[in-house]
Amino acid sequence: MKTSVFFGTLAAAGLAAGVAAAGTLDDVKAKGFLQCGVSTGVAGFAFTDASGEWDGFDIAVCRAVAAAVFGDAKAVKFTPTTGKTRFTALASGEIDMLARNTTWTFSRDADLKFTFVGVNYYDGQGFMVPKALGVSSATELDGATICIQTGTTTELNLADYFRANNMKYEPVPIETNAESQSKYLAGACDVYTTDASGLAATRSTFEAPGDHVLLPEIISKEPLGPLVRHGDDEWGDIVRWTLNALIIAEEKGITAANVGDLAAAAGGDPEINRLLGTEGEYSSMIGLDAKWAVNAIAAGGNFGEIFEKHIGVNTAIGLARGLNAQWTQGGLIYSPPFR
């Protein structure tokens, strides 16, 4: 999901610069764990299971980074954040990275001073309505009441879309996905709008998901991905290349099941050898153990395995890969070369 840019948040930007200068990798190692900011809960993306353990598509990125740094995917603690609190938590150093359905935008980079290390889900804003409302297009929503998370790009996109289509709406402000779901199901709003993936995730938790419709319009680009503070390129490289390692692993057929065997000795693919530490001294370039990528992949699998386990077509959420397929399969998922 996205969270809005608060222009002029110079204090947050100053905090980010000061904290980053301290050296995040050293701080993380000194603590003995990674502190990862996540959402307050979105089915499939970030949730706690029956035993209270965090799991999900975004959670897997945090665990992969922990595994890359410590060799232990459990060396991570999670800080739930809302659309309003996530950026302050990152800028202040309360968290070491943010992996929380957050849209990469110009202002968040240039004004708030955050570095988006990549995209792990290409999304767009959509609309969900009760089937009983009898609406088949977002262009029929003139005068509707709409549940909208505050502090998000969703707010801005919604205003732009309705203005461009000469329509009016009444916003029903909410702060968390759980609050949105509760108010929407209680009839406090006609429509719920957020990232299409978030709508699918939310609908999957309903008692009667078939009673609710996702309208066909996608009104924005929402490249979602993990982010860190400006000013600490070493730490940014670690998080960036951990994500890239998961993407390369899928492209090359490296899985959680076979990564150990492939890393046991150099094989015929030079890029696999470089990634898994059997050729060259690449790990020293980012200050990690030679098996950092092996550990990251073993933690939860490659990018495709993580996607299919948590949000893919065989889950309750049922998302097709679409734009999030590998570039070789017509999607946008693509890593720079590991060389």
Go through each PLM region and give its residues:
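Gram-negative bacterial Sec-dependent N-terminal signal peptides
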Residues: 1-21
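Extracytoplasmic/secreted envelope proteins and their assembly/folding machinery
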Residues: 22-25, 58-66, 84-87, 91, ...
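Extracytoplasmic small-molecule ligand-binding "clamshell" domains
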Residues: 23, 30-99, 288-293, 303, ...
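Sec-exported extracytoplasmic/periplasmic mature domains
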Residues: 29-30, 66-74, 91-95, 132, ...
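Bilobed "Venus flytrap"/periplasmic-binding protein-like clamshell domains
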Residues: 35-44, 54-69, 103, 123-181
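Extracytoplasmic/periplasmic, Sec-exported soluble proteins
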Residues: 37, 53-58, 78-82, 87, ...
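Extended ligand-binding regions for polar small-molecule ligands
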Residues: 60-63, 67-69, 132-135, 139, ...
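Acidic, polar ligand-binding/catalytic clefts
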Residues: 63, 67, 71, 75-140, ...
